[in-house]
Amino acid sequence: LTLIELLSEGETPHLKDIETLINNRNFASYNFHTVGEEHSPISDETYKAMVRQGIQHCLRGDVFQIVLSRRFEQAFKGDDFKVYRALRSINPSPYLFYFDFGGFRIFGSSPETHCKISNGRASIDPIAGTAFRSGDVEIDRKRTNTLLNDPKENAEHVMLVDLARNDLSRNCQHVQVDFYKEVQYYSHVIHLVSRVSGEIKPDSNPIKTYMDTFPAGTLSGAPKVRAM
């Protein structure tokens, strides 16, 4: 490895600092591999009970939708950035992220823009309605038609579009649906996507508008507070 530093007159050299960082080798130089079995702090039976309870809340009319999840943990050795690189290759998405905070790292991928603000307008792109890609154009066409006519998928989509409208209405005026149930194709799935947008009110601001849309309805359910 050869390092060359080009400096203008009066600039402070940093070549030694760079050499020190390289020689410290404070990064994993070996491949990534898992250690032991994955586990979750929530057992299968507990999670099934949560699902049954969620169904009862829906049947009673307490909520329209509940989004249940549980965390899985997996010990590993190696460079986790390799997992992120594999994710980019296996599941390319419009939004990929990798944050290194020193003591922990967060990475993932998503097709969804939760909330975008530009030139005084805020928009939310609800995604609800999903079918797997088959690799065959004709099969994908049939799955798209099935998706567009599925009562459950359409009901969920309508709910999330209305939720986006409600969230934006807190801080926006002239809220509208820019496009509705647009079919979008990704590497592994077919999605139904809509866009709801509005003009930020003079007495509000982008930060408040953005914060008041959290959490995403696709992650919380609806009504948000009751569902969570």
Positions of PLM-derived features:
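Extended alpha-helical targeting/anchoring segments
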Residues: 1-228
